[in-house]
Amino acid sequence: MTTGKSLIDCHVHLAALPDGNNGCYISPTMLKNVLFRFLLWKHQLSPTNPREANQKYLDDLLTELRASRHVQRAVLLGMDGVYGSDGRLDRAHTEFLITNDYVLEIIRKYPKEFLAGVSINPQRRDAIDEVHRCADAGAVLVKVLPNAQQFNPADPQYKPFYRALAERQLPFLSHVGYEFSLIGRDQSMGDPNRLRLALDEGTTVIAAHACSYGLILYEKFLPTFQEFATRYPHFYADISALTHPNRFMMLLHLRRHPELHDRLLFGTDYPLSVFHLPAWGRVPFRSLRAMIRTKNRFDRQVSVCRELGVKFHSLDDIVMQPKPIR
């Protein structure tokens, strides 16, 4: 097991309010979203002062990341919009947009702490060009949320897109399961079986949230995870949000399936909370007390998973050079 400050968190959201220059967008509906309003309140971000709020979000993230005992860098994730059949941005149906240009700008400012996780909806008409542009700019993965971005990952028309990702060796990090943070239009798009096409085209796929369904006790996608892990050497899953009440059943399943640990990658789903609930009654009291006292979300995620016996890799283990499982 590797120790020290060496992990990369592959699932950290870059949040930003539109400031007139960053190209970001938030719909009126999203501004009224309960979770969105809660996050604004929790991080003390004022929507009336977007530039100040955006910098405060970054400053808070940097402070927590730099204070972590285990995590040295974070992949900042963008969020592409919805695109129509003509491949053009459909702003009317887009709830949240964090542009790749903004992601790349932040990466250039803080290269020691952050890596670029751009977002490219394969439905956009310039999707393949955007893959190459972002790869040239140093992106390390492409993140999508099909439920909210309104595309079917299994659509054969996206084969050239997946081949471009494979060519540029950019992992495809896709949300799996129900989506509650944003407004999911079609929750069936979160079925990991829809990622089979990308895998068949040679793309390295990372299933977010370890393929958990997101509906508390029912984990219907565990067999899919097991099949993909057996069939595809380029399939992985991150452990982001697995301490949440609606997803921690998958974390408990993973305790009983150590053969899957070699496919797990570290992630948190920052800025969402990390809970110690899954550890109650399952770890020594001393360990539980340490988790409760740990306020750093990156370190608590490491602690909960490791104390439960769930091992994982860091992103650089698969995109750079192989390293021992952590």
Would you name each region that the model predicts?
Residues 1-77, 83-94, 302, 312, ...:
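An N-terminally biased module of ancient metal coordination in phosphate/nucleic-acid-related enzymes
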Residues 48-62, 93-104, 188-193, 219-225, ...:
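Well-ordered, non-membrane alpha-helical segments in soluble/globular domains
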Residues 125-135, 153-161, 183-199, 215-229, ...:
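Distinct, well-ordered alpha-helical segments
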Residues 79-187:
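Active-site gating/metal-coordination segments in enzymes
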Residues 13-18, 81-84, 122-126, 149, ...:
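Active-site environment of divalent metal-dependent phosphoester hydrolases
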Residues 8-12, 74-77, 114-118, 142-144, ...:
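Hydrophobic faces of well-ordered beta-strands that scaffold small-molecule active sites
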Residues 24-26, 45-51, 83-95, 181-189, ...:
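Short, flexible/disordered intra-domain loops and linkers
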Residues 211-326:
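H/E-rich (His + Asp/Glu) clusters that bind or coordinate divalent metals
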